[in-house]
Amino acid sequence: MSKNYPTPHINAQPTDFANTVLMPGDPLRSEFVAKNFLTEAKLINNVRSIQGYTGKYKGIDVSVMASGMGMPSIGIYSYELFNFFDIENIIRIGSAGAMNESVHLRDIVIGMGACTDSNFAAQYHLPGSFAPIASFELMETAIIKAREVGASFHVGNLLSTDRFYNDSPTVTDSWRKMGVLAVEMEAAALYMNAARAHKNALAICTVSDHLITNESTTSEEREKTFTEMMEIALETAYEITLKNQN
């Protein structure tokens, strides 16, 4: 661990964080998780209004901190958490747009892999293409927990894109034919940072919009009603923490 803290983006000490951090994009969702699911929640970061909290879930320490939007933003926060604060696990909890007929509004997509149109991996100077994938242990645990709560969920590839507004409206058709389930903007960078740091990451997304049916949820719904995804992530953090304590 590099002793480079507090950082320009996280005004905390390593002991302020639990080993597992839940990472929504929206700072208001971070606050929502802390206030509705954690006990003894303490604000540990508010630099640039990126709220971070640590509290207890079923007696186990869990942290939740926002990432902001896009790969550059989650790239900064996840890098600092993995490398400067020695966090072991980051679980992204966010929204995604469905791009497959089998996926429905408010379904959950667990990102086994994350395709991307970003050049984030160029920094590694690899002699080929890198395939960003989730931590198997986190993913396996999340799947078990999703089944236990009876969630409508899917496991497969996400598309992490750099562009929310794309000049070509049909660009997702090419990804759809490869079986990609949903599009979001963060998972690939998170998975690559985890791989490089030899740490663990997982993205659990709730479908907020549908690119085929044009259905959508409101910003308030995205902030306050995607609780099933939050519960799956918290239960995953709980099980992983217990396992590592034994």
Where are these regions (language model features)?
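Flexible, glycine/charged-enriched surface loops at secondary-structure junctions
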Residues: 39-46, 150-156, 241-246
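A C-terminal functional module that forms or caps the active site or interfaces directly
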Residues: 169-208
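Short, structured patches in soluble enzyme cores that scaffold and shape functional sites
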Residues: 66, 95, 112-114, 142, ...
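Generic non-transmembrane alpha-helical segments
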Residues: 141-149, 193, 232-243
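Active-site rim beta-loop-alpha module in soluble metabolic enzymes
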Residues: 129-178
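His/Asp/Glu-rich mid-to-C-terminal helical/loop segments that flank catalytic regions of hydrolases
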Residues: 211-246
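Metabolite-binding pocket within alpha/beta catalytic cores that recognizes anionic/polar moieties
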Residues: 1-137
